[in-house]
Amino acid sequence: MGRVSGKVALITGAAAGLGRADAIALVREGARVCITDVNAAAGETLAAELNRGSAGSAYFIRHDVRDEDQWIGVIAEVKRRFGGLHVLVNNAGVVVMGTPESTTLDQFRLQQSVMSEGVFLGCKHAIPVMRDAGGGSIINMSSIASHLGYPVYFAYSAAKGAVRSMTKAIAVHCQMNKYNIRCNSVHPGAMHTNMVETSAKELGIPISAFEQMPSGLGQPEDVANLVIFLASEESRFVNGAELMIDNALAVQ
């Protein structure tokens, strides 16, 4: 308990899956959180659950990460409510399966806008507020797809690759300017989330097929444990890193 006590965190795509697990873990470890998502019903439900366990620890804002004006409003509301921001988890994502030949331009642009542009906008507008709060930690959710050649996840891989590269540039920028802000990317493998279940259906395979891989199927809580480490002062010298959480899937 208390590994991130006193910190304020903003988590995008937090209504389900990895983001939901991150929010639960951050509140459990003492943070106050703003959770955002386009799914207002699920987001409000999660905020209510978190507040039942720890009053005043969470609130929800409906937020499309593709919209810069919404980013400005969300960051301003976090600062107004909690006085600052110490942890940003850029988690929002979307998958539209397709190969380099079958992917449409609209599908490609959608995934770039949610993940690549969404991460850019989040970092751009969070950095000044985090700097003024004395520093903090930016955690960008990438994927092992940014390292591996998955033809059926073509546009998704491209977007997550952009997140991987941006993370390094942001880390160096903040270090050179002495902002005391760290920026790292997390690269999950196959995790038991709604997104992976949907992918399995589209591939025509049962979710158990992922479980039977040598690396197995991870749980959202596995990623949340890593997020807590990166959000806490335990990782104070970890900056610009790529943290794989895939049970060696990417190195096989």
Regions flagged by a language model, labelled:
Residues 99-100, 104-109, 138, 196:
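Substrate-binding pocket helix/loop in short-chain dehydrogenase/reductase
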Residues 128, 172-176, 236:
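Alpha-helical segment proximal to the catalytic Tyr-Lys
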Residues 143:
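Residue(s) in the substrate-gating loop at a strand-loop-helix junction
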Residues 123, 159, 167:
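Active-site helix of classical SDR
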Residues 3, 148, 228, 239-252:
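Short C-terminal tail/terminal secondary-structure segment
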Residues 212-223:
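A conserved structural motif in NAD(P)-dependent oxidoreductases
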Residues 177-182, 238-240:
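Short, small/polar-rich loop/turn modules that mediate ligand/substrate recognition or access, typified
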